[in-house]
Amino acid sequence: MTLGFWIIKILATTLGETGGDSVTMSMNLGYAIGSFIFLGIFVVAIIAQIAGKRFHPILYWMTIVATTTLGTTMADYVDRSLGVGYFGGSSILLAGLVASLAVWRWSEGSISVNTVATPRVELFYWVAILFSQTLGTALGDWMADTNGLGYEGGAIVFAGALAVVAAACYCTAISRTLLFWAAFVLTRPLGATLGDLLDKPVSHGGLAISRYLASGILAALIVALILLIPQRAGVYPGGRIREEEEALEA
């Protein structure tokens, strides 16, 4: 993974927060309806992504954003509408992530993204990503809302944790697969707290920026970086996701 990949990933997770809140809060559609809307978008995106014979950067990142927006609304629904709270919601979602990775490993023998070379394995990949995004949202809300850290403090904590994972990648022999999934989960609460910092009212510790404006700016930044960062196409078979990682070279 390169720095360019992770910068776009953090922007995508932040967009997932502001975009999800735009539908559920600004449009006042609620968490359940918002989740159904984003579920539909996610299903369409993942079908197109898996059906593609080559790597399409815009499509790949659209699918990532679809998982972050759906993760936002699903986490809010589980935590708030179902009344299980942040701890209960995070526990349920963690169990879902572990189960999805366990089934993937049991079926294919590995959960490394370097093995994603068939549509079936790619489906495992996207299901695990969806659980990781939803879990990350719940963790971000839990940290910011219940520990007195606020959005800025929560963002600093998760940025620090992400830095530790990055250091471990260069300084230890810890499994790169484990570090990848740890980083993938941690970018989500970082983006969630940054998104809340942007659009929540000043009285709640935010900057009160319009959710629509924040989402538009974030989307524009993502598109600009996708176009600016050199990317190479991958073809089945041979590990399309792996080539997606290698393509994002800053």
Please state what every model-predicted region is:
Residues M1-A250:
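Polytopic alpha-helical membrane proteins, predominantly small-molecule transporters/carriers
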